[in-house]
């Protein structure tokens, strides 16, 4: 057991320590330092590690145990919520407003959270990943207004969720469910949700032992990538189609 997190060199090709070496307290803290280059970020995700820190902190790298994971064919939407979708006119698209989604995730107030972990450097890092075809967004629209969304990173047949937002009740649920349906139909079985909270568990997330999560990641990231841009493949869907 390690009592201190590893210190990463700023050199982008410096390897991460094994995720199993993460601290028990705080749960999952593995390393400090490094940078947010695409090379570093992709190496992190491929190793079951993600960045999470606030403005003024150095990059902090995490791999908690247990890990929160969705099966892409098992998103729970309540009967009441599904009934409300029958009259919905909202539409859902992918990769048409990535920057707006990440900005909304950063700026939307959240209960129990002061400020945001999506710093300016983090924003630029994920915009670069999006330009390289790794980071993707799913967007929910009321007419032309963006009312909800989710973004994350796809490698092989694994999706690593990062954040979601909603300015209208239920829009983030629609974004997640639409993402999950799209992934399931394209043989992507898992969505990493990182750290548990009751909202995610209510939506069907499961707590996985880290070793099981890492085993799945190692297998799925080697499989064929989805296209670099999802907008055409995803198309435009009506939220009521989720019913």
From Swiss-Prot:
Keywords: Acyltransferase, Cytoplasm, Transferase. InterPro entries: Acyl_CoA_acyltransferase, Leu/Phe-tRNA_Trfase, Leu/Phe-tRNA_Trfase_C, Leu/Phe-tRNA_Trfase_N. Residues 1-22 are annotated as: Disordered. The keyword Acyltransferase applies. GO terms for biological process: protein catabolic process. GO terms for molecular function: leucyl-tRNA--protein transferase activity. One of its GO terms (cellular component) is cytoplasm. It is an enzyme of class 2 (transferase). The keyword Acyltransferase applies. It comes from the Bacteria. It catalyses: N-terminal L-lysyl-[protein] + L-leucyl-tRNA(Leu) = N-terminal L-leucyl-L-lysyl-[protein] + tRNA(Leu) + H(+); N-terminal L-arginyl-[protein] + L-leucyl-tRNA(Leu) = N-terminal L-leucyl-L-arginyl-[protein] + tRNA(Leu) + H(+); L-phenylalanyl-tRNA(Phe) + an N-terminal L-alpha-aminoacyl-[protein] = an N-terminal L-phenylalanyl-L-alpha-aminoacyl-[protein] + tRNA(Phe). Belongs to the L/F-transferase family. HAMAP family: Leu_Phe_trans (MF_00688). This is Leucyl/phenylalanyl-tRNA--protein transferase. The gene is aat.
